[in-house]
Amino acid sequence: MQIVETTNEGLKRAYTVTIPAADIAARVEGEIKKIAPQVRMPGFRPGKVPANLVRKMHGPALHQEALQTTIREAMDKLVADNKLRPAMQPAVSLGEGYDEGKDAELTVELEVLPQIEAPSLDGLKLEKLVVPVTEAEVDEAVARIGQGQKSFTDAKKGAKAKDGDQIIIDFLGKVDGVAFEGGAAEDTPLELGAGRFIPGFEEQLVGVKVGDEKTITVTFPEDYPAENLKGKEATFDITVKAVKNAGEFEANDEFAKMLGLESLEQLKTLLRGQLEQETAGLTRTQMKRALLDQLAAGHDFAVPPSMVEAEFEQIWAQLQQEAQREENPEEALKEIEAEKDDYRKIAERRVRLGLLLSEIGQANGVQVTSQEMEMLIRQAAQQYREQDRQRFVDYVRSEPLAAAQLRAPLYEDKVVDFLFDKAEVTEREVTREELQAAIEAEEGAAAEAKPAKKAPAKKKAAKEEAPAEEAAAEEKPKKAAPKKKAAAADEAPAAEEAPAAKKKAPAKKKAEG
């Protein structure tokens, strides 16, 4: 086999590889000898079919298989002999006019990973913004649960409904005098002042009594999900069947026992733990972004364009999906299109950070254990139907690239934790609002990719936390979804989705989307 380098520019490499016809033919002959004992043909005893007949029957298929195997081996040799670290799968093309009996002339094009030295971790300093959980916040959390457990009892006869009361109603909605689908319901509980129905609905029912029949007029919002009701004026015929007063909520041991706990103190302890876990997640997000900003500021090496393009395509696809869910998809698409160059630079930053974190992890022995990997696979399999889970597990175990993409986020977190341990960390107590503002500021600064302009405040900033793969030479960057600047934690979804519209009762505000 002959290998000739034809391009060596920056991170681009190209080669011509010549595989002698004799090598391919020898592999074909070897395969014929392997399968001959299993070939059956009328007129011949089992295993006694002549090689020339086996070749005639199976030759083309065996040649194609031998050619593909030889090409794979040639690629392995090319990578090993030249100590290459491909950024992505090399592009391999077989010369035109190739036929059996001829030498195979291959053209190979690829991009390699840059040579990166793991940076010194001396002098790495980080500030940890800590939000203490106050007793008032715990009490508020208890009160919120109490609101959800609110009980109602019948009001005195003839009592008029007021804000905070619950009324039981039948209603029939009409547009232009005609009832519309989903606009009628019976025995519907409605808490006045809760804001669960469309604007103007609840307000007109303050003061009603049991037995009252009333017709109210409302206007559906312009962003109402049902196209036939958007902006339309409608009337609702209301029959009041009950008026109920809310019971007084009291935070005590009895209330905690209603929730299956032993005491109010136990409830508060659980809620405090939840609040502390939530703020700890925000603190980690702030520290991680500050860390990545420091790393990005100190490194500006070239990265493979193919990796940047793959990362950008993932970001772009997610942004387009988000835009389609906006109130005005066309306007949202125009907005992201105007900022396309910014997002491409964000993709470049993410790839660069991913390679850098990978190098740091490998240089310092950071690993994802087999037990951790097994847990990852099992957790990921849960998103599939039960009958498909084992197939997914088998696929990940047999496909190195699939396993690498699954492992990458955990590996990145382990590298980040390693850097946290190495850094000189100073703590400062702040309020939740101050912590959130710090996250927003870091996210906005990260989105400013030189020499691009700073991203607008309402721009959806792509996630800056780049991948950090365990074997960068063999793995693509993690394809993490972009997210809005308003997202609080780097583990958060790309966009908070509004609840789906309820078809049952269009009058409810929840159905507004």
UniProtKB/Swiss-Prot annotation:
It catalyses: [protein]-peptidylproline (omega=180) = [protein]-peptidylproline (omega=0). Residues 452-461, 501-513 have a biased composition (Basic residues). It comes from the Bacteria. Its main location: cytoplasm. One of its GO terms (molecular function) is protein folding chaperone. Residues 164-249 form the PPIase FKBP-type domain. It is an enzyme of class 5 (isomerase). This is Trigger factor. It comes from Novosphingobium aromaticivorans (strain ATCC 700278 / DSM 12444 / CCUG 56034 / CIP 105152 / NBRC 16084 / F199). The lineage of its organism: Bacteria, Pseudomonadati, Pseudomonadota, Alphaproteobacteria, Sphingomonadales. The gene is tig.
